[in-house]
Amino acid sequence: MNLGVRSAPVSSATPGTPVASPPFPVLRLGRFVALPLHRRSLVVGLALLVLLCAAAAATLSLGRLGVPLTQLPAVLSGRGEATHLFALERLRGPRLAVAAGTGIALGLAGALFQSVTRNPLGSPDVIGLGAGAGAGAAFAALMLPGIVPVPMGALAGAALAVAVVASVTGTGLRDPGRLIVAGIGVAAMAQAFTHFVVSVMARDKAAVLAAYVNGSLGARSWDHAATVWLALALAVPLLVVLAGPVALNEMGDELADGLGARASGTRTAAVVLSVVLSAAAVSVAGPIAFVSLTAPQIARRLSAAPGPNLALSALVGALLLVSADLAVQHAPVAEGLPVGVLTLAIGGVYLGYLLIREWRRGRL
């Protein structure tokens, strides 16, 4: 396998014409994988990783059952007091693993969707994908328990939501105005169906599932963590292969096709992968709103780099969700709320900002 770092041309040229190269090196893995190494992105990624580790340490150490920071290394290695081991293995550890994995999945799903639609509003949240996945998960869990696994129900619901939006808009998820209107309609129908299933068809379980409907990380287990991290493990190799074609796709279909990226196939693969990641996240934590909308936008502004910024979007998504979960566990204002309510409040403000910005630019 050819493994090396070099500057590579981004477009073909006729003989005698200088070939344009990116202003940053490219890591090549074999013939088909080329990953840009943007210096600012590397620095930002390292900073985000440090912040994520700090938020994770705070999650494990704060509160009545928290593990003191001085004892955290020993407890993580399997030593320490029984109460601390119990808190790590049964309470804080699974919740943290689910929060980080769900944030990564939502960040990646949003980055893929926004990149292939070339639209900052082209988020799984806005088009009703999360709500559709939540409806499918609720239906599988309550109406077909033991017959259809919850992740499969979420996947079916998410796929159906995307198909309906694409069919209604008739523009392949590209027109921002139609995308928003269709997404709002699909999300409203999916949420209505979810509430109907939870409150009418399964009244005895409504109280237990009320938090899940709004997006919650409470009472998570290692099984939930395994579900979302397995989906990520399966998706990462595909993401590595898709990173280059997705970046070229942002330049337009004609240029992407001319450079061998096959825009239509790239778009289809990215949407399918986004649906799978969103479904995995929703199946373990419920429809947590607006992480997939805000994480890619924050990553793009921090890095100032072209392309989908997949790695940074994943880190920002994890940091947002772990921090939001930390807030609902310990902040007096948000304590006790499902984490999805907090992300909805913050993300709703950001969505309003995006709508105003796109309207002023004449894109709505």
State the predicted function of each range:
Residues 2-364:
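Alpha-helical transmembrane segments in inner-membrane proteins
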